[in-house]
Amino acid sequence: DVDFIGLCLVLLLFGLFWNAIIAQLDTLTLEYLTTEHHRYSSIRVWGSIGFIVMMLGSGWLFSDVDYAVLPWLIIIGLLVSAMISFGLPARPETHLASADHTGIGDRLRHLPVLLFFAVAAVNQLTHGPLNVFFTLYVQAHGYTAFEAGQLWALGVFAEVVLFFVLPQFIRSMDLRVLLTVSLVLGSLRWILIGAYPDLPWLVIGLQLLHAFTFGAIHSVSIEFIRRWFPGKLSGRGMALYSGFVFGLGGSLGAMFSGLLWESFGGSLTFILSGLMTGIAAMIAWFGLKKANLGVQSS
């Protein structure tokens, strides 16, 4: 038997420290890249590749091995990551180069900053039904567990492709346009998954949109943080992004999707997520005109 309270505490502690690590890792990545910050997605892509490898590998491993070994495998992986981190070269000093001496509070008084965090959090919130219930949802509509796993892999594969391609044009486009288009595609993705889950070819195509609903939006978000929270503000800006978007947005998405799923069923839950994402797209387009997301030469 699993101690529910004990499991919740373990996950709480893990989430507390893991989110802190992710925020600082993104900050360090941008500092290492210095003027080549547009290459962020070329590094972030390896996390997605690792996800695919572990997902496929775990499916093979746990067909013969008990799940009790999973925590030990996770611990080993984290220890290896920690040891590798000690081998990283000293990062370049970039804080002194920043001429912007405003504090974190000054940044948070700007309406575009608040709107951007709200849009990004809503986008993460509307991923709740996917993250929590997608496997159960497609299985309830006749897909096998293996097919559900392949749909997950397909979505992350599309994300990998976008991460490889994005650095080539991210500096030459208006990121507000990319953000808005990605949110519109997200709205279509959730609504159509909710309305037509029995069409395999459509579900496959919609999974490819994960490249935009996560990959593109995350890349735009990282660039937004870089522009609005430069120098010594970068770590706190990234921590705010991670905590507010993935922490608050992700947890509320999981909670509300569970409540809606129980009350209205899976299809309507996805459709409501799509409508919320559509509202977020309109806020992004009309509310972020002064969000400093235009084309930059460096």
Residue ranges and their predicted role:
Residues D1-L11, G194-L206:
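Helix-loop junctions at membrane interfaces in 12-TM secondary transporters
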Residues P112-A153, H218:
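Helix-loop boundary and gating motifs at the non-cytosolic
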Residues L12-W46:
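Cytoplasmic helix-loop-helix junction between adjacent transmembrane helices
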Residues V177-L192:
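Structural signature of the two symmetry-related core transmembrane helices
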Residues T34-W46, A145-F146, F229-S242:
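Loop-to-transmembrane helix entry/capping segments in MFS-fold secondary transporters
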Residues V69-G87, L268-G287:
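Symmetry-related core transmembrane helices of the 12-TM Major Facilitator Superfamily/SLC fold
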